[in-house]
Amino acid sequence: MAHLFTLSELSVTEIIRLLEDAEQFRKGHFWRPPEPMFIANLFFEPSTRTKCSFEMAERKLGLHVIPFDADMSSVQKGETLYDTVRTLEAIGVNALVIRHSQDAYFEELRHTVRTPIINAGDGCGHHPTQSLLDLLTIRQEFGTFAGLTAAIIGDIRHSRVARSNAEVLTRLGAKVLFSSPEEWKDEANPYGTYVDIDTAVAEADVIMLLRIQHERHAEKMGLTKEQYHERYGLTIKRAKKMKANSIILHPAPVNRDVEIESSLVESERSRIFKQMENGVYVRMAVLKRAIEEGRMANGNYFEKWQVVQ
């Protein structure tokens, strides 16, 4: 399957292969298709890190990026996502990167669109490339996932990052802890155990802090930013309870002094900006997979890819 909608649809072997490819890109290996390839990034939600790192990855691979601005497209005239995607497929785009506010937007495209689609985030659903860059960061630090404890802290219910990470970390042999305000618990997520934040911080090898998803809340948060930070944030006091070799992750954007004390964002334990760096390598690996498997699915079985080292 050339599409990447969720990590749950990939085997552990496929996930590890993507991480290995990403690590090779980090070490300076390059891959180029033998002919021009065209990519369109369809972002229907605001994005800095995901959009820019996809564009960086595409340019590093020598791919041609087709500009797309949802606010200036026919979407504003009522065109559906399906028709937008089919239009780009018809004009010859080789792969599509899509972020959309609708959960599981890709289900209507799964069996009707042959062009590979990479999910860059669907509503409160999934964020596979964020999970992959988190996995790469953890793997670089610990060399394995088995036996690790990962604490996911914050707005669990509305976070696609929490959903994606909890599932894949469990499959890879890690223990997942959740900690959040009562109203933001996701009781439908079977992959973690809820504990209080102090227990989570003390037991975790990996502390994953989540941004408060204000744009997905039907009601305003019942706490002030200061109250949230005191009760559920990674404060200086809580950070002192961390294990000797534990690390801090955050998908960003970071609300400083809300989810995490500002001085901890670039502290010795933080890998937040390392995650962003790894995002480029992971997305290079994902794009390579999409184009290779997309061409195979379309009958180009005898094409050979050029690997430049």
From Swiss-Prot:
Catalyzes the condensation of carbamoyl phosphate and aspartate to form carbamoyl aspartate and inorganic phosphate, the committed step in the de novo pyrimidine nucleotide biosynthesis pathway. It comes from the Bacteria. This is Aspartate carbamoyltransferase catalytic subunit. The lineage of its organism: Bacteria, Bacillati, Bacillota, Bacilli, Bacillales. The gene is pyrB. L-aspartate binds at K77, R160, R211. One of its GO terms (biological process) is amino acid metabolic process. The keyword Transferase applies. Pathway: Pyrimidine metabolism; UMP biosynthesis via de novo pathway; (S)-dihydroorotate from bicarbonate: step 2/3. Its EC number is 2.1.3.2. Carbamoyl phosphate binds at R49, T50, R99, H127, Q130, A252, P253. It catalyses: carbamoyl phosphate + L-aspartate = N-carbamoyl-L-aspartate + phosphate + H(+).
